[in-house]
Amino acid sequence: MANVDKAFGLRPYKGLNTGSAVQQANSYSIDPSGYGTAIYQGDLVIFAGGYINRAAAGSANIVGVFSHVYYVATDGTPTFKNYYPASTTALGGGAIDVFVYDDPNQLFVVQADGASAVTCIGRNADTD
């Protein structure tokens, strides 16, 4: 039976440090005026203009991997999601906090778009 083709971005697997059995995501900000691109769990992210943005294929200076977002919706509801809906704004222009796996010693599982040799296991992935 062939492997299932179900792309999921980068999924945290484990850390290389002895104390990092639990993956930890650190907090960053998205432009509170409403960044116009959706970001999904497992997407690579970069800094642009001081805020987190979704990385394009081949982007340099990757900050890390998007985990989830927290903000207070315009109706006053505290909101946690595993994706950032495009052009979201928070109540009163408040902060939109995104959580990013940014530890350089974090290992991830990622789906390839073709056959991979055994020698690829444990190596870096090219995002082009």
What kind of region is each of these model predictions?
Residues M1-D128:
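Surface-exposed, low-hydrophobicity beta-strand/loop segments enriched in small/polar/acidic residues
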